[in-house]
Amino acid sequence: MKLNEIPAVPGNQQSRNRVGRGPGSGNGKTAGRGHKGQKARSGGFHKSGFEGGQMPLQRRLPKRGFKNFTRKEYTIVQVEDLEKFFDAGSEVNAEALNDLGLLGKKQKSGIKLLANGDITKAITVYVDKASAAAVAKMEAAGGKVVLAVVADPEGDA
């Protein structure tokens, strides 16, 4: 039996309440909107944030900051993840991390290695960025961190 084949419990499904369909329905005439006023009319209610003519909060507060569209966002991989998922002597790259599901679904600018946890295995890791503490831990365990060289778009040609 599948979920879509389970029958409904008798008396459990209530039909939609159709308003404005005569006095016998219990919701005729005003259709539950009360008498007159802006809320009773068609065409919607005031827009969200409207404060009755008073200057809205969103316009009273000053503008601040900006959104940096060239900002790079990195997927974080911890040293303890390498200890947990990889054997000594293995080479770890983006493909290996992705196969284990460590990179997540969202594609980001690159991979950054951080120093959370401990490592005892000598592993070679290919990443875009790494913290100084992470590099120190990897080298202390006999491993190596290889950083990807990114070409400078405004560099000398």
Swiss-Prot record:
What job does the chain carry out?
Binds to the 23S rRNA.
Bias class Gly residues marks the residues at 21-31
* PROSITE patterns given in the database record: RIBOSOMAL_L15 (PS00475)
Quaternary organization = Part of the 50S ribosomal subunit.
Q: Which GO molecular function annotations are given, in alphabetical order?
A: rRNA binding; structural constituent of ribosome
Location of the region described as Disordered in the Swiss-Prot/TrEMBL record: 1-64
Family as reported in the entry's similarity comment:
Belongs to the universal ribosomal protein uL15 family.
Please indicate if the UniProt record lists Electron transport as a keyword: no
Q: Corresponding gene? A: rplO
State any GO BP term from the record. Answer: translation
* CC terms in the record's Gene Ontology section: cytosolic large ribosomal subunit
Does the keyword Electron transport feature in the UniProt annotation? no
Q: What is the protein's given name?
A: Large ribosomal subunit protein uL15
Alphabetized, the UniProt keywords read: Ribonucleoprotein, Ribosomal protein, RNA-binding, rRNA-binding
- What's the domain of life for this entry? Bacteria
User: What InterPro entries does this protein map onto?
Assistant: Ribosomal_uL15 (IPR030878), Ribosomal_uL15/eL18 (IPR021131), Ribosomal_uL15/eL18_sf (IPR036227), Ribosomal_uL15_bac-type (IPR005749), Ribosomal_uL15_CS (IPR001196)
